[in-house]
Amino acid sequence: MIIRQLSAITLAIILLTTATATAGDYGRYYDKLPIKMAEPDAPQIPDNTVSIADFGAVGDGITLNTEAFAEAIRAIGKLGGGHIVIPAGIWLTGPIVLKDRIDLHLERNALILFSPDKKDHLKDGKVQSCISASKRSDISITGEGIIDGNGEWWRAVKRGKVSDTEWKDFQRMGGTEADGGKLWYPFGLKNYDDIAPDFKAQEKMRVHMIRLTDCERVLVKGVTIQNSPKFHLIPTRCKHVIIDGVTVRCPWNAQNGDGIDISCCQDVLIVNNTVDVGDDGICMKAGGGAAALKYPPVARILIRDNTVFHAHGGFVIGSEFSAGVEDVAVLSNTFSGTDTGLRFKSAPGRGGKTARIYISDIYMSDIRDQAIVFETSYVDVPVGTAGKASEAQDFLPEFTDIHISNVVARDTRIGIAAKGTTQMIHGISISDCAFFCTEKIAELSGIEAFGEGSIKLENVKLL
């Protein structure tokens, strides 16, 4: 194995990035919280360092470097773990599978670009996420570079959400139009083969950008994550996760372009991030229905000092959360240009119960719909379908023990909206808030009025 002699400055930056995460500097975010939680344990990465270029990788945007990434991961693994440095350049690759005690470090002007050829994401007939890890510990993705999922080669497009020029650009790629020209699918493209027999089957094979499953001690810091085929960053059943200073972005109309989705995780810090995406911004999920009961709830999550621009919701719980969501603090965040600000959505068959959710010091502007919305009959509408209301009689959503204070929302169409019964929406307190509404101050359905039994308002200005 050849190990390139990295510059002292590069090595110092890498070590500083991971050392600051292990030195307990996140403790200041946990002072005087409304609920008890401790800062997550950061990953422990050995000091070994290699460059991806040492393994034959070429950053020319043309050479496919999948095997070079795999070889670098194997090599650093034999050393007990360490840092894999991605220098400046465009590094085209297929899926990257991380192992224990590895830091993937992107230097400034480094761009990891995932292959637009869907066949490069296939293994044993199944598609792989762009970056993944399963049942691993001490994983980090750090630096100042960009990770790009090439999502436009995967996502369906709705004609009503793009300009004439953009629509013609998609048509020039080839593809398949459906629903009377209202939809375009990247099936039958001019330059790349399909991986499914029809466009509907291929649509279901879209991959996530970064999917970490059953992992412990995870750090994602500083990088830009953009243009995912589906969700961007989705830790699932992970413990001790830190997401710090990350930019997550994709076109506003990207189908299912969720930003940060926390699914059945515990002890998570989400801090100093910027999100600008096509679906939910920062979202808590906990599985839907009976299958979710074998998993732990989302628990002990701190979300603070983040900015969300376009998203369907700035902070979201749902739609599936049957395992429960508890002990969450959402503090000092800004939402500018989101469809909704605080969004609580679910439906029978996928609901669960919330507990000890504290939200305060939230600043919103230019909110397209509601500043705060509770919805218990949410209908998921996959692209190309009409959607269908749930007929389930079990796993009813119960949004309760939610406390919202010190929210200022300017230019929101509706201040507070709730759709559901007092059995599903109760124990909600909203205090010391001001909502400047452009259409109506409130919209209630099923709940007759604000009050002790459902949503209690105290010192709230609705203008």
Regions found by a protein language model. Give the residues of each.
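Extracellular "leader-to-stem" segments immediately downstream of a signal peptide or signal-anchor
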Residues: 4-11, 16-85, 90-103, 107-214, ...
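Short, small-residue-enriched loops and turns at beta-alpha junctions
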Residues: 58-60, 289-293, 323-324, 350
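Short, T/G/N/S-enriched strand-turn elements that build extracellular solenoid repeat scaffolds
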Residues: 73-77, 92-101, 222, 231-237, ...
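Short glycine/acidic-rich loop motifs that flank beta-strands on beta-rich extracellular proteins
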Residues: 81, 95, 115-117, 150-154, ...
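Conserved short loop/turn motifs at secondary-structure junctions
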Residues: 86-93, 259-261, 347-348
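Active-site-proximal loop/turn and secondary-structure-junction residues that shape catalytic pockets
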Residues: 90, 237, 247, 286-288, ...
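Right-handed parallel beta-helix
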Residues: 108-109, 137-145, 216-226, 239-251, ...
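Extracellular beta-rich repeat passengers
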Residues: 321, 332, 341-463
